[in-house]
């Protein structure tokens, strides 16, 4: 039961960090002129110049929660003693988790560079494929459903990660659409994990 109590605490903490970082990133975007200019791309519907760096705010919130969780392990176990057994599994998966965090950071840096310098599509695609390949190879992420051949599974995983990259990236035509879609996906995966008793 402790996990069901712990996750809402993590969620609220991330929400608070996001509320802190979002206005700061907004100010930084205006200062550095990292803006989404209206009608610069056909699918964008902004009526006026809009500050970017929303992805940076989300990543900083994610990273802050990870750091806070790592530093506050003793406090967690005091209030959520049921986490003890699960944390052993977290320790075993730590190398893969570090790879995932590093790949997430690389994706954010790639996005920031693109926001500022408007990369050519093929260059951005190469960067995304490299990040996805590292994630699929060393990050412990693999799509194996109905697939028994490791190489085919790896290729599908890389394709899927790149697909998600661009799906979320394409949702930047309206404010809040990307984060709203990501929230719906989060709720779906949370329900699936809860149904499978997989914390």
Model-derived segments and their meaning:
Residues 2-199:
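"…together with the soluble PPM/PP2C metallo-phosphatase catalytic core" -> "…together
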């Amino acid at each position: 039961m402790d996990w069901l109590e712990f996750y809402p605490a993590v969620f609220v903490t991330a929400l608070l960090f996001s509320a802190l970082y979002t206005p700061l990133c907004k100010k930084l975007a205006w200062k550095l002129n990292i803006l989404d200019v209206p009608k610069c791309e056909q699918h964008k519907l902004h009526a006026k110049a809009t500050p970017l760096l929303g992805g940076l705010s989300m990543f900083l919130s994610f990273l802050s929660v990870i750091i806070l969780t790592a530093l506050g392990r003793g406090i967690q176990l005091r209030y959520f003693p049921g986490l003890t057994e699960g944390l052993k599994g977290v320790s075993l998966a730590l190398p893969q988790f570090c790879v995932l965090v590093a790949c997430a950071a690389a994706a954010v840096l790639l996005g920031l560079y693109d926001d500022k310098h408007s990369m050519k599509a093929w260059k951005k695609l190469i960067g995304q494929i490299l990040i996805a390949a590292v994630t699929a190879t060393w990050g412990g992420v693999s799509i194996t459903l109905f697939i028994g051949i490791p190489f085919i599974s790896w290729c599908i995983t890389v394709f899927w990660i790149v697909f998600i990259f661009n799906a979320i990236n394409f949702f930047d035509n309206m404010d809040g659409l990307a984060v709203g879609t990501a929230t719906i996906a989060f709720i779906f995966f949370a329900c699936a994990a809860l149904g499978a008793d997989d914390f």
